[in-house]
Amino acid sequence: ADQQAVFDYCVANISKKPSKFADDTVIGSQFNQPLLEFSGSCAGCAETSYARLITQLFGEKMYISNATGCSSIWGGTASISPYTVNKDSGHGPAWCNSLFEDNAEHGLGLYLGQKTVRENLIKRIAEIAGSDKASAELKAAFDEFMATKNNTKANDAPAKALIAELEKAAAAGCTESAEILKSKEFIAKKSVWIFGGDGWAYDIGFGGLDHVLASGEDVNVMVFDTEMYSNTGGQASKASNIGEVCQFAAAGKEISKKSLSEIAMTYGYIYVAQIALGANMNQAVKAIAEAEAYPGPSLIIGYAPCELHGVKGGMTNCQNEMKKAVEAGYWNLFTFNPANKAQGKNPFTLTSKAVDGEKYQALLANETRYSRLTRAFPERAKQLFARNEQVANDRYEHLSRLVELYK
């Protein structure tokens, strides 16, 4: 009871601490209010860790289109919403979900809709600012707004200043300013996110995802990669790995995991990142911030250990399991930022180390989704696990060559 009182006081009274540290750092992001809370996901769920972090970075300006799956269940169970508003501004993520597997297209529609409204508003404001009757303050506010128009973070304060000047103009009798203010929530730059799991991104929604990424529009895709269809009970997906035991692969999956990240990289103009929050928080925060700032499509794939993996010790070890996966070479951390080319920098950054065979096999043995194959078919398990490790070695060598090729 005493702890509940302390918790209630903190929720009601502890405010965010802006400007103490940069938002795009681990420590700075954690001074911002999470706009995802009390989600009802499985205890230790990795997906909510990623979503929570993104809301701390961009939550007040976020539009979220969510694929149907685990993230739509903990993200929007009927009658409640774990997404909340900032208690200072009253703003928070606008969340929606399409039941049909067209989430990428749905998210693109959200982006294009608000983009069209915003561009029309900017055109109308430009006409007001360019007239002889416009005040010097309104002209200056509009110039500053236009200078930051395409930067979500930098555009926030200029947008508020511009709205304040439009309100003054409306109060002075400008009817056009008054009309524009009816849609003032569209003036500031928004951050549009498309959330979904690997079943959606790698499999049944891949066609739409590919279409949206290829469009070149400024949308951000966050894939929670659990390496299986988690929400429906653990079926194999194209993200499942060799030797993994799950539904439709009861004797262990025989083919290797699809490399969604590298497929996206072939376009050359898509920001791509693979992250694992528990393994390298700095890399994860930096990648998310860079992806959002990139003026084009971005794809972030986050490793997300699931309750169905059967991690020894339970999901209290979720974040540590991410660290083990990266240290073993099971999961690679990297970013591909096309914007670096214009600055003479290498667009591809590989943060991971090579495969450690001993740690790799220990990781597989630490998860029931693999160890159950050893109990049922020991010889088959030995063969498939060796292939799993070899594919990981080949993939790391390939990624290492990409570092040199992109120089």
What are these regions, as identified by a protein language model?
Residues 1-14, 68, 72-100, 309, ...:
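Terminal amphipathic helices with adjacent charged low-complexity linkers/tails
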Residues 1-56, 63, 80, 93, ...:
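Flanking helices and flexible, charged tails adjoining ferredoxin-like Fe-S electron-transfer domains
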Residues 4-5, 14, 74-75, 84, ...:
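Thiamine diphosphate
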Residues 26-40, 97-112, 116-133, 186-188, ...:
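Conserved thiamine diphosphate
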Residues 39-79, 196-211:
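Conserved phosphate/anionic-ligand binding catalytic regions in large, soluble enzymes, centered on
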Residues 48, 53, 57, 61, ...:
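Generic, well-ordered alpha-helical scaffold segments in large soluble proteins
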Residues 79-93, 284-380, 387, 400-401:
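Glycine/aspartate-rich loop-and-adjacent alpha/beta segment that forms the canonical ThDP
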Residues 100-176:
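N-terminal leader/propeptide and maturation segments of large enzyme subunits in energy/redox metabolism
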